[in-house]
């Protein structure tokens, strides 16, 4: 693995998973890169593995139940800084459509779900919008 790559568990197709070196995720403006500390396998990950996810395209890095440490921030991190322990909210929404304005981001007209529409967190790093981060209390291991 070089400085520009990371390890990720890639679902190539139903029932076929490979541990691969993949490029580090880009960190666009308004995003943070998070180094994974822990992930949880969700029922939707199992459905994807079995080929029962209608929304997922292959290959895909699964995983949307994530906890990690901020490794890089592009832009104003607001209350977040490099080194903060965070949990990651899985829905990436536009913030502007009718559903988003009613705080129903899961119904966003442009909804992207980590590990379904975009690369997830069963990898060393994931890149997510800063607004999708939730700070983990420092007292929590």
Role assignments for model-derived ranges:
Residues 3-9:
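Short structural boundary motif marking the start of a folded domain
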Residues 15-19, 43-44:
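Short N-terminal binding/cap micro-motifs at the start of the first secondary-structure element
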Residues 44-50:
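Cytochrome P450 core scaffold surrounding the K-helix E-X-X-R motif
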Residues 5, 17, 31-33:
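Intrinsic-disorder/low-complexity, polar/charged segments enriched in Ser/Thr/Lys/Arg/Asp/Glu/Gln
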Residues 12, 24, 57-63, 114-118, ...:
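Short Gly/Pro-enriched turn/cap motifs at secondary-structure boundaries
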Residues 94-141:
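NAD(P)H dinucleotide-binding glycine-rich loop of Rossmann-like/cofactor-binding domains
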Residues 25-39, 52-98, 132-139:
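Glycine-rich beta-strand-centered segment in the early N-terminal region that forms part
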């Amino acid at each position: 693995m070089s400085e520009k790559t990371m390890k990720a568990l890639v679902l190539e197709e139903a029932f076929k998973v490979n541990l691969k070196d993949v490029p580090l995720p880009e960190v666009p403006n308004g995003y943070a890169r998070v180094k994974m500390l822990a992930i949880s396998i969700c029922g939707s990950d199992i459905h994807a593995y079995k080929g029962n996810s209608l929304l997922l395209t292959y290959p895909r890095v699964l995983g949307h139940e994530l906890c990690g440490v901020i490794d890089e921030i592009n832009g104003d991190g607001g209350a977040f800084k490099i080194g903060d322990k965070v949990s990651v909210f899985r829905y990436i929404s536009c913030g502007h459509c009718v559903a988003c304005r009613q705080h129903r981001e899961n119904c966003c007209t442009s909804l992207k779900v980590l590990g379904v529409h975009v690369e997830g967190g069963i990898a060393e790093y994931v890149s997510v919008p800063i607004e999708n981060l939730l700070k983990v209390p420092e007292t929590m291991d």
